[in-house]
């Protein structure tokens, strides 16, 4: 039996009704809507937490996040976690990436890590053979600096300077990784920072210069937020196109979800609450899965599921 490849796409702070296939009122998610039509859409998919890092711990380990000390910080904050040998995913702990790597898979994380900082923690220490992305919880999309103004863009274990809109950089790297795989199964964890603050589209380079505090309350609008989702969706379209071009699409399980519910400017209708709330709007998120070789098209699944179920499914 030919082993499938896996592409796990994680959005950041996406609301339950932000996508057209979940009732969104704006046409900003054509590729994800098509992916849902070609596969399976869950109505009752939940994130492991209403905030970032704990959900990522659960996804990486397949376990309840609070079995690890680092997940008790909700989320891991740059100001307290840099250099801290405790607040992170222990390299000795088995992960989805390490187990698939040991089974012969190529593994890459493109995007957001947020499970502890070097030198104690990092994607390459936890099963990923390639990494391009950010270590912290939120960065400026153009300057690639965290909320404290520290540069945060890495290639492997080393900081790297790149020009460009972060969502586009991640999409390009992810599509490139897919194209480089030759007759070998792979795990691509594509963990976008969008549409997490700061709210910037690829047309907002000047806004990046204006904003001095990237956290939460400076900048943004509903229209900016929707454009961020559209540009995220365009990037996902490029990755799906790369799967088609290489002939890998048929036997690749592609999953899309969010790490928690939506925050400011998002649409969580008809749910109550949002990010940081242990209410439906904070933990009920979009779940889309496409696997042409195995999953029927256009199905709606109303069973309960949680983030770490995907880990068990892949393994």
What are these model-predicted stretches?
Residues 1-315:
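Formylglycine-dependent sulfatase
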């Amino acid at each position: 039996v030919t082993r499938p490849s896996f592409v796990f796409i994680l959005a950041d702070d996406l609301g339950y009704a932000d996508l057209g296939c979940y009732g969104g009122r704006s046409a900003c998610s054509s590729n994800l809507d098509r992916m849902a039509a070609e596969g399976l859409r869950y109505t009752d998919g939940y994130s492991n937490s209403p905030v970032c890092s704990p959900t990522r711990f659960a996804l990486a380990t397949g376990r309840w996040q609070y079995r690890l000390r680092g997940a008790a910080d909700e989320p891991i904050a740059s100001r307290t976690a840099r250099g801290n040998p405790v607040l992170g995913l222990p390299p000795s702990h088995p992960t989805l990436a390490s187990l698939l790597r040991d089974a012969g898979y190529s593994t890459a994380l493109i995007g957001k890590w947020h499970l502890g900082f070097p030198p104690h923690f990092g994607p390459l220490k936890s099963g990923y053979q390639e990494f391009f992305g950010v270590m912290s919880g939120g960065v400026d999309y153009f300057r690639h600096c965290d909320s404290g103004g520290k540069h945060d863009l890495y290639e492997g274990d080393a900081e790297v300077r790149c020009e460009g809109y972060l969502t586009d950089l991640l999409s390009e790297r992810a599509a490139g990784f897919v194209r480089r795989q030759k007759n070998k199964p792979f795990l691509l964890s594509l963990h976008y920072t969008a549409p997490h603050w700061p709210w910037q589209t690829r047309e907002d380079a000047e806004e990046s210069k204006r904003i001095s505090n990237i956290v939460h309350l400076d900048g943004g609008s509903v229209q900016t937020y929707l454009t961020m989702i559209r540009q995220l969706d365009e990037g996902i379209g490029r990755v799906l196109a790369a799967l088609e071009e290489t002939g890998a699409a048929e036997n690749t399980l592609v999953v899309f979800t969010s790490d928690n519910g939506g925050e400011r400017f998002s649409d969580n209708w008809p749910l109550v609450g949002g990010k940081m709330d242990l209410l439906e709007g904070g933990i009920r998120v979009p779940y889309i899965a496409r696997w042409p070789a195995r999953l029927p098209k256009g199905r709606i699944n109303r069973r309960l599921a949680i983030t770490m179920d995907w880990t068990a499914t892949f393994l």
